[in-house]
Design a protein with these regions (language model features):
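C-terminal juxtamembrane segment of a hydrophobic transmembrane alpha-helix
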Residues: 1-12
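Flexible, low-complexity segments enriched in proline/glycine/serine and punctuated by aromatic residues
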Residues: 10-188
Length: 188
């Protein structure tokens, strides 16, 4: 019975954490798609982020231990007590002429509020198997999501996204447009 209760509690926390992570991704996506934002409105840059890391997704974004100081406490049930710590970050992506990111990779990690680790939290998600313990909630994130965020309705959106996804491609290696078989010349 102890295993059943512990597993149920862990699953409920993981489900809440996943929903919270998805809301953070969606909130940033809507902000960028609306187009009225500055760099300050976006998730902070990941430590050590550089131009070469811009298309890294999945495990490549989690190479360094996380910094506890950059996780924000969140109260999901409105009881006045924080339930989770949310860490949002991005890597340098494609910028417009004003230096505003218009395409970038973003990650969200959601930790239980009771995490320990003193600034050295794990980046591997906690296990969701049957357990009589905390299942890794003490040091590991309950939810980890990654996504590519990009503007989609501005004049240079297609070119910016293509440059972001294939920064080292030669002009003839770029993805074709539906009408001409190539991207517009302005993208090259």
């Amino acid at each position: 019975m102890v295993i059943s209760v512990a597993t149920r509690v862990h699953s409920q926390k993981a489900e809440q954490a996943l929903g919270l992570a998805q809301r953070e991704i969606d909130r940033t996506r809507v902000l960028v798609e609306r187009g009225n934002y500055t760099v300050v409105d976006l998730p902070p840059l990941a430590p050590g982020a550089d131009q070469d890391a811009e298309t890294a997704l999945g495990a490549n974004l989690t190479a360094a231990p996380t910094d506890y100081d950059h996780a924000d406490p969140v109260d999901v049930n409105g009881d006045g007590d924080d339930d989770f710590l949310v860490q949002r970050y991005r890597v340098i992506g494609q910028e417009d002429g004003d230096g505003i990111p218009v395409a970038f990779a973003m990650g969200v990690r959601v930790y239980d509020i009771d995490v320990s680790g003193g600034g050295n939290l794990s980046t591997d998600p906690a296990s969701l198997v049957m357990t009589s313990s905390d299942g890794g909630r003490g040091t590991q994130p309950l939810a980890v999501l990654y996504s590519t965020i990009a503007t989609s309705d501005q004049g240079e959106s297609l070119c910016n996204l293509n440059t972001y996804l294939r920064p080292n491609a030669l002009p003839d290696q770029n993805e074709p447009s539906p009408t001409s078989g190539r991207l517009p010349d302005s993208c090259n």
